[in-house]
Each structure stands twice: as structure tokens, then as C-alpha cells.
Amino acid sequence: MVYHDLIIIGGGASGLMAAIVAKDFGMDVAIIEGNDRIAKKILATGNGRCNITNDTISFPFDTFHSENSNFFLETLNSFTIEDTKSLFLSLGLPLMKLEDGRMYPRSLQSSSVIDIFRMALEDKQIPLYPNCKVTSVDKKKNFTLYTNNTDYEKFSCNKLILSCGGKAASKTGSDGSGYKLSRSLGHNIIEPLPGIVQLKLDYPYLKALSGIKFDGSVTILINDSVVRTERGEILFTDYGISGPAIMQLSYYASKALYNNSKVTIRVDMFPNESKEDLENFFTTHFSMFNYRDISSSLIGVINKKLIPIILKDAGIKDIHLPCGNIDWKYINRLLDKFKKWDFNCIGTNGFPNAQVTVGGVDTSEVNNITLESKLVKDLYFCGEILDVHGDCGGFNLQWAWSSGYIAGKSASN
């Protein structure tokens, strides 16, 4: 049996942070990692550049979400963006700010972040046990951990941090096994759901729309009530819809679909213009080219591949009819589609394609100041395993750094 004062299960972002902090506080700490190397999920973040944090994060932290909306406030206040920048600089990794406050390593390489952590573990002599999947945990006086590695079948520790992640991006090793360990120690799990993920639509012309992208705004409606609107690039696919604006809204869709609610995705192709603006423009436009068919008249105004589809949706069956011969009520329907093109959302693209997990360990059972379990003494949590997630844009990694720091510090006291 291998003994350490503190063992961290999971060598992802939050677990690595917790280990470094605990070691700096003088703890005998080790990391057990199920993969063959640390932080595989970091490689995929920020399109391979690693969006480490976001410079816009501030109280009341409305880009973070949990069933317990106050849980994360203390943690994010205690280890801030400035603390994150300082800590990475101390490890040898300067950061730079790009669009929308997103911060990256100056190298713009995710691999740099992993290399910096790997060197930090070596410098601080923090043992790492890779290819070691923890299958069960017992708690008596100390914690006893059992693994599937024949060389290291059994571990013991006085204090334990669970930083096993969630279920998102499952190809990186995130299989939800931390939930099983948490349940075995008495904790409840808020149903894990895919977040920051593409959405599936029920629409007959998806194959024709596939590959079309444009800048616009997207609104999600739950049971016909508006919940949130986002602007950005919108991409249609053969299964539904994607793009940054969609990814931001997907959290609401996941939860609503799980609760069997009606989910509508409303696309506004002209977010900078009002319906009246469009009426004025098209009145002039169609008058100038009243001899042209309606289909040709829309070329240059919207994506050419969209024209026959949106005309059908507006009830204009003959797309070769001259503009001057079309009843204005049909033109009005077309303008309505430009501003409010509604789609029925029937699902998400699942955990393999999700960037974050919605749900996790019930935070009502965790101390919001120390991140120690309220049920099991000397058990701590950090990162995505908890029922906390953020919007797309570096917010989830900031939660990893902040919660990892607090868990590592608290476990060292």
C-alpha cells in the first residue's frame, strides 16, 4: 500500500492546481491519474490555444451557473483572475488577452500549459501515478483507495480531493467515474447533462442548410418563454445548429429537454435592423427590381443557399415569381422569418462533443468556503465534478483554478 498525507484523484486542471498549492503549503501530496498523462482535456480548449481565463470575470459572476447560485461566489472571490495571472507567471507562463477578454498563454499553445504543469510537478517533487484508475474508496480512520493498476493496487491517505472531472469530452477520459466515488461516500449527484454543445433540431431541410453560416442572434425559448439571447456566428449542420452563440445557450436547452420542456431556437438573421427597417429596405429593393423573381432579388442580401428554404418557410411556393406579383402578406411573412426563424430543438450532440458538464456533486453538501464535504471529514472537491459550470470563454477553467486553489489550501490546514 502506498501512503500520502493528501491524495488527489484526477490530474486535470483543478487537480493540478490543488496539488501545487498543497505542496507549497508543505503537504505530502500525490496525484492519481487514470490516463497515461495529465490534463488531456486542456489540449482541446480554446481551439488548441487554451483559453485559460477571462478578464471580464467579476462579481456577481453571472457567467457561472449552479443549482445553488451562491455556492461559487466565495471561491471566485478568494482566488481571482489577478491571482490566476500571477500564479501562472510564477510558474513561467505569461498570459495575453485577445477577443472578448479571453486570456491565453502567450505561446497560444495548449501544450505549453501542460508542459508548465509537468515541469512544476517535477520541480516540486509531486508524485504522479498515471494509468491508475481509482475504482473504489473506503473511509474509516483514513481513506483507502483501490485501483485497476496491478503495480499500485492500493493507496491510503489522511485527506482526499476528488477532482475527477465530469462526463464532457469523454474521449479525453472524462467518464463520470468521480460521481460513482462521490455516491459511495454518501453524496448526491445533480443529474449530469451536456453543456457548451451543439443542438439537434427537428427540421425537414437540415441537409440543404448544412454548412451555411452567418452572424446573427439566437434566442432560446423554454415553453414559449424567452430565456436568453446571444449574438455571434451561427452554423447549420446536418443534425441541427452550432456556433458560439448556440454553444452559450445549450446549457438551458440541456436542462429543459431533461425536464421534458418545449425548447425553441429562434434565429434573427438581421439583429442590427428592426422589422420596420427591413420593411423600408425591401419596399425599395423589391420596387427597384420588381421584374426580377423573388429568389434572384434576395441574392446578395442573404446566403444564396438559404433563399429557397426560407421562401418555402414563408409560404412562397413559387420562388421564381417576380417580386411585383407577390402579395405583400407573403413578403411580410418572409420578413418575420428573417427576424424570428423558429426551430424545434429535440436534443444535444451529447457528452462526446460537449465542452463542459452541467450538474455534478450537489453543492448543498459541500462547504462553500473550504470546499470540504459536509458529510465526510477530510474529503474535498474541486473542478467540474461539482455542480458548477461557466459560459464558454475561459470561465470553466477559471472555476478549475479557483476551486483547485481553495481545495488544495483547505486540505493543507
Describe every region a protein language model picked out:
Residues 49-97:
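Glycine-rich active-site loop/strand segments that organize a redox cofactor
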Residues 130-142:
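A conserved short coil-to-beta-strand element within the FAD-binding core of flavoproteins
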Residues 7-9, 32, 134, 154-171, ...:
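Short hydrophobic core segments
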Residues 7, 23-47:
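Glycine-rich FAD pyrophosphate-binding loop
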Residues 1-14, 30:
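Beta1/beta-strand and adjacent pyrophosphate-binding region of the FAD-binding site
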Residues 2-4, 149-159, 229-231:
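Core beta-strand elements of the Rossmann-like FAD/NAD(P) dinucleotide-binding domain
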Residues 129-130, 308-389:
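A glycine-rich dinucleotide-binding beta-alpha-beta segment and adjacent secondary-structure elements
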Residues 36-38, 43-44, 52-59, 188-191, ...:
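An anion/pyrophosphate-binding glycine-rich loop and adjacent beta-alpha core
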